[in-house]
């Protein structure tokens, strides 16, 4: 059986990589993928702690996070497509103002 701390280390490493991607990268699509990596690292920790303590709440929280992430991706990709049509760029720095 894999020890709990391996899952925690994996979650922390993925979280740091995702946070670095959100803070450093300038491409909106890469920032969105880094945000997904952040949320999936949290899911790994939820499931690991839920399994370690024989509790299903970790899995339930992970399912909720996956559902919220799916909705977030749908909205973000819609905004991204509209942005590419209007501004013809995916760089965060080029998009300074959005009109309603």
Swiss-Prot record:
UniProt KW Transmembrane helix keyword: yes
An example Gene Ontology biological process: ATP synthesis coupled electron transport
Keyword Transmembrane annotated: yes
Gene3D superfamilies found in the cross-reference section: 1.10.287.3510
Keywords assigned by UniProt, alphabetized: Cell inner membrane, Cell membrane, Membrane, NAD, Quinone, Translocase, Transmembrane, Transmembrane helix, Transport, Ubiquinone
Main location: membrane
Topology with respect to the bilayer: Multi-pass membrane protein
Transmembrane annotation, as ranges: 4-24, 28-48, 60-80
GO annotation, cellular component aspect: NADH dehydrogenase complex; plasma membrane
Pfam families: Oxidored_q2
EC supergroup of this enzyme: translocase
Location within or outside the cell: Cell inner membrane
Catalytic reaction list: a quinone + NADH + 5 H(+)(in) = a quinol + NAD(+) + 4 H(+)(out)
Subunit structure: NDH-1 is composed of 14 different subunits. Subunits NuoA, H, J, K, L, M, N constitute the membrane sector of the complex.
Role according to the record: NDH-1 shuttles electrons from NADH, via FMN and iron-sulfur (Fe-S) centers, to quinones in the respiratory chain. The immediate electron acceptor for the enzyme in this species is believed to be ubiquinone. Couples the redox reaction to proton translocation (for every two electrons transferred, four hydrogen ions are translocated across the cytoplasmic membrane), and thus conserves the redox energy in a proton gradient.
HAMAP family referenced in this protein's UniProt entry, alphabetically: NDH1_NuoK
Protein name: NADH-quinone oxidoreductase subunit K 2
Gene name per UniProt: nuoK2
């Amino acid at each position: 059986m894999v020890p709990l701390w391996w899952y925690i280390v994996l979650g922390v490493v993925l979280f740091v990589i995702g946070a670095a991607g959100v803070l450093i990268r300038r491409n909106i699509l890469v920032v969105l993928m880094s945000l997904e990596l952040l949320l999936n690292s949290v899911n790994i920790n939820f499931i690991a702690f839920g399994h370690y303590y024989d509790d299903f709440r970790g899995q339930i929280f992970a399912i909720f996070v996956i559902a919220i992430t799916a909705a977030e991706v749908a909205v973000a990709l819609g905004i991204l497509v509209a942005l590419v049509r209007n501004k013809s760029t995916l760089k965060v720095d080029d998009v300074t103002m959005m009109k309603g």
